[in-house]
């Protein structure tokens, strides 16, 4: 919804693995969907249901923890980004706080990646201009480009 507010002339496509999340997002964004400004799909980041060079921007907020393999997932994001497109990742955990371990202990399949792991996987997927920032609370934000 916030991306729609910031992109009054754009089209937003949302993808989530969870059917429950897809239905909630469709309900929240009903007006924009009816206007043709938004679509929400169920999908898997390991095999994104889009053609190459489809998007100017791909975001991942609090989600890469649950991707089965970030290397393959980042390659999929790279594939669907247009040349010059941006990939933005925001995580509340940076993998360096001992408190992070409690989450991986109670949430099956969750992996908290360090900035170094994310940067390496982005580079291996072909991304350039990679910037990774962290704050004092442990939040991590990575931004990079597809340039080719």
Protein language model regions, located:
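A short acidic, Gly/Pro-enriched loop at the edge of an enzyme's catalytic core
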Residues: 46-58
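Surface-exposed loop/turn positions
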Residues: 10, 52-54, 84-85
């Amino acid at each position: 919804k916030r991306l729609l507010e910031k992109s009054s002339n754009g089209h937003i496509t949302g993808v989530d693995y969870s059917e429950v999340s897809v239905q909630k997002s469709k309900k929240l964004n009903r007006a924009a969907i009816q206007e043709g400004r938004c679509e929400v799909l169920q999908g898997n980041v390991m095999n994104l249901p889009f053609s190459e060079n489809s998007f100017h921007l791909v975001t991942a907020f609090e989600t890469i923890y649950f991707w089965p393999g970030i290397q393959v997932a980042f390659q999929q994001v790279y594939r669907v980004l247009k040349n010059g497109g941006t990939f933005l990742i925001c995580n509340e955990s940076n993998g360096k706080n001992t408190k992070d371990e409690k989450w991986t202990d109670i949430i099956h399949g969750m992996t908290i990646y360090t900035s170094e792991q994310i940067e390496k996987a982005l580079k291996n997927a072909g991304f350039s201009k990679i910037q990774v920032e962290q704050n004092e609370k442990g939040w991590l934000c990575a931004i990079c480009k597809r340039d080719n």
